[in-house]
Amino acid sequence: MSRRNPCKYEIRGHCLNGKKCHFSHNYFEWPPHALLVRQNFMLNKILKSMDRNNDTLSEISGAAELDRTEEYALGVIGVLESYLSSINNITKQSACVAMSKLLAEINNDDIKRLRNKEVPTSPKIRIYNTVISYIDSNKRNTKQTIHLLKRLPADVLKKTIKNTIDIHNEINGNNQGDINVDEQNE
């Protein structure tokens, strides 16, 4: 078997020369250095195509553009409620990204205050602890939290989303109530 040089176009992605190309396209014939260069190039290509700042959706697809996302039209809570009621064709990915953004908005201390008000045997304590753990995970690594949420079964994810929205509304309701009481005292 003759050992031909690896195709430089194949190393940098894909060779379009077809049968006219006289270089080797068989990876088993390539020297280790050429394989490493190809692997590094492909990994860099994947890394560049990922949008790490926004919502882990690809920039190439255009999904990261604000005016094209469901969140821009519906808001974070709207996306989650649409996913719960199965309207507006909200995907699990979009719901998980919106859930991650909602978790970033909620303050741990507010949930701990709500949890401390409950009776020690209350089933709500477990729900509060679950949401607190997701918030902590989200602060450490947003992408990993989104990945964990996506791996949940659909019914468990929906329960988690519903509980988180309820807690968010409860916190906002309490904060609004505190503001109204302060205004009345003045």
From Swiss-Prot:
The gene is M2-1. One of its GO terms (biological process) is regulation of viral transcription. The keyword Ribosomal protein does not apply. It comes from Bovine respiratory syncytial virus (strain A51908) (BRS). It comes from the Viruses. One of its GO terms (molecular function) is zinc ion binding. Keywords: Host cytoplasm, Host nucleus, Metal-binding, Phosphoprotein, RNA-binding, Transcription, Transcription antitermination, Transcription regulation, Viral transcription, Virion, Zinc, Zinc-finger. This is Protein M2-1. Phosphorylated by host in infected cells. Only dephosphorylated M2-1 is competent for viral mRNA binding. Cyclic turnover of phosphorylation-dephosphorylation of M2-1 is required for efficient viral transcription. It is found in: Virion; Host cytoplasm; Host nucleus. Belongs to the pneumoviridae M2-1 protein family. Homotetramer. The homotetramer interacts with RNA. Interacts with the phosphoprotein (P); this interaction is required for protein M2-1 function, localization in host inclusion bodies. Formation of a complex host PP1/M2-1/P allows P to target host PP1 phosphatase to the M2-1 substrate. Interacts with the nucleoprotein (N). Interacts with the matrix protein (M); this interaction directs M localization to cytoplasmic inclusions comprising viral proteins L, N, P, and M2-1 and mediates M association with the nucleocapsid. Interacts with host PABPC1 (via C-terminus).
